[in-house]
Amino acid sequence: KRIEKKNCMNWITKFIKPKIKSLFKKRSSDNKDALWTTCECKNLLYKDDLFNNISVCPTCGSHHKLSPEERFKIFFDNKEYTILETPLPKDDPLKFSDTKKYTERLKKAREQTNQSDAIVIANGKLEGINVTVGAQNFSFIGGSLGAAAGEAFIHGIQHAIENKNPFVFFSCSGGARMQESAIALMQMTRSVLGVHELKKANLPYIVVMTNPTAGGVTASFAGLGDILIGEPKAI
């Protein structure tokens, strides 16, 4: 009986317990409507508590990813801001396909994030000062820079210049979007020229690099701020 009990406990410990943990972790981390999430330090965190701590784990200090709207709620006075409508170029001009059609990837990303593309631009006040703010969403195809994201970035700069606002940008990207090839690479040049126009207008350009900021985004507009602020593991 002791042997049977020991074998039963081994079976529960080795097979059942890990499966339950794995299932719970998957549900808490992947379901955006879940009340709980897990940290890389393996702590289980209540999402509201995590957000109230600006999405920094109170145990290990790990910075969890924030969507653009979550950042805006933290950044702007009284959580008050206006999302700016940005130009949206034609999808998939190259008819790109790998393991999945690019149009399908865009559709899925839009459904998951409720965004038209990776960059969102907003306007609001910080300490009573009007500010134009942009942010990338890593959940939208890795926050990658394509034609639509490039248009949004330029639109943000134009809005800042027209309203004489400082421009603050939260970068979070794996780089240029490979599905758009040379079109994506062109956005690097366009964004650099846009930053140049902002500086000609003598307006502050502040970049907050978040985890991760890499590739063509680092090599273009993310590295050109008058002030560069880096969150842990940003590069």
Model-derived regions, located:
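Terminal-region recognition feature
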Residues: R2-I206, P212, L224
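Short acidic/polar capping segments at secondary-structure boundaries
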Residues: N211-A214, A234-I235
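Short glycine/serine/threonine-rich phosphate/pyrophosphate-binding segments
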Residues: A214-F221
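Gly/Pro- and small hydrophobic-enriched strand-loop and loop-to-helix capping segments
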Residues: G225-I235
